[in-house]
Amino acid sequence: METVNNSVQSEKSRRRVLLKLSGEVFGGGKLGVDPDTVRGVAKQIAAAVPDVEVAIVVGGGNFFRGAELSQSGMDRSRADYMGMLGTVMNCLALQDFLEQAGVETRVQSAITMGQVAEAYIPRRAIRHMEKGRVVIFGAGAGLPYFSTDTVAAQRALEVHADVVLMAKSGVDGVYTADPKKDPEAEKLDHLSYDEALRRDIRVMDQTAMTMCKDNNLTMVVFGMEGEGNVTRAIRGEQLGTVVTP
């Protein structure tokens, strides 16, 4: 298995990133999909594709949040599956706008739905990226109780991404405290996973951080707000907070 992994790494000549987009990004702060918002994000991704191989994991919070639905009395597993289906709707919306922007795109789903998406196969995803296509991963891990942050870390490791890019709404990086509650909170340009876990920083999922730490994968937490931030993050420009092992 090690030989296969090494051969994949040696074949990879361009920077390869895994971009995590929250469901809230697709809704523009509302329920459902906001076409103008998704079109804008797609254009930013398209601008970076000629230079970088891009895979994307999307959330589904603009439709359903399994944990919140379960608090209302719904079975957690069933609620999580509803959330997974919501991510696939976001995948299809982003695929449409990326292809309108001239970027070949493939959707891979962890839950089989052959009419709208390919099955999730890591090696096929890698080949798509090598051919200049964007790959969007939907349906989370295909299992309940896994956040899409954790799925982003897992997919990044499976497709041998160089970095995980966590795009956030309403915050431009990691702070010493919640900047909305503490006016003295300071933004951190760099942070180790050990420090983030010790401080119990909640801007990203702790399981995802542990997975990245254990596998020496760098994460960048950055804000969606700001002209061209997604393009800049994909290209590797300095912004947000860099979290390293």
Swiss-Prot record:
The UniProt record lists the keyword ATP-binding: yes
Q: According to the UniProt record, which cysteines are disulfide-bonded?
A: none
Q: Which residues cross the membrane?
A: none
Keyword entries, A-Z? ATP-binding, Cytoplasm, Kinase, Nucleotide-binding, Pyrimidine biosynthesis, Transferase
Q: Which reaction does it catalyse?
A: UMP + ATP = UDP + ADP
EC class, as a word, reads transferase
Activity control, as annotated, is: Inhibited by UTP.
The subcellular location is: Cytoplasm
Protein name, as recorded: Uridylate kinase
A GO term for molecular function: ATP binding
PANTHER family associated with the record: URIDYLATE KINASE, URIDYLATE KINASE PUMPKIN, CHLOROPLASTIC
Q: Which GO terms describe its cellular component?
A: cytoplasm
Per the record, the similarity remark reads: Belongs to the UMP kinase family.
Name any one Pfam family assigned in the record: AA_kinase
